[in-house]
Amino acid sequence: MSLSDPIGDMIARIKNAQVRNHKKVALPSSNFKVKIADILKSEGFIKDYKIETENNKPTLSVDLKYYSGNPVISTFERVSKPGRRIFSSADSLPKINGGLGIAIVSTPKGVMTDIEARKQKVGGEIICKVF
C-alpha cells in the first residue's frame, strides 16, 4: 500500500493510539520517522521507541507516555503537507504555545527542533508541531 503522506500517517496513528490509551503503537519505519521519534523521546513526549523487523519489513514501535492517565502529547499537528510545503527562516521560526511546545524542522543540517534550529541559525521546512 502506498501512502501519500507517511509523516501524517505517523502523527494520526500516535494520536489515535493515545485517544484509546494504548501503551504502544506500531507503524512502518523509515529513517525520517526514526529521527522524529528520537526528537520526541529527547523532548520527553514519548517513553521510548525501537525498530523491529517483521517479514523483512522494518516496523517502528513507539512506547507512548502518560501523566496521571492523560497523554503527555496534547497537540500533535502536521504543518507542512505534501500539497503545501511550509518553509521558514531561522529568525521567523514560530514559538509553539509561548515556547512550551516544539516544532520539528527539517533543515540542511538534519531534522531538529525549532530551538536547535534557532541556535544554529538555520531555517527549513516545518514538519509538525507538538505540545
From Swiss-Prot:
InterPro entries reported in the protein's UniProt record: Ribosomal_uS8, Ribosomal_uS8_CS, Ribosomal_uS8_sf
Keyword RNA-binding: yes
One GO BP: translation
GO CC annotation, single: ribosome
Entry keywords, A to Z: Ribonucleoprotein, Ribosomal protein, RNA-binding, rRNA-binding
Stored SUPFAM superfamilies: Ribosomal protein S8
One GO MF term: rRNA binding
Pfam family, one: Ribosomal_S8
PROSITE patterns, per the entry: RIBOSOMAL_S8
Highest taxon of the lineage: Bacteria
Assembly notes: Part of the 30S ribosomal subunit. Contacts proteins S5 and S12.
Record family assignment: Belongs to the universal ribosomal protein uS8 family.
Physiological role: One of the primary rRNA binding proteins, it binds directly to 16S rRNA central domain where it helps coordinate assembly of the platform of the 30S subunit.
PANTHER family with a match to the protein in the record: 40S RIBOSOMAL PROTEIN S15A
Protein name as catalogued: Small ribosomal subunit protein uS8
Provenance organism: Pelagibacter ubique (strain HTCC1062)
Gene: rpsH
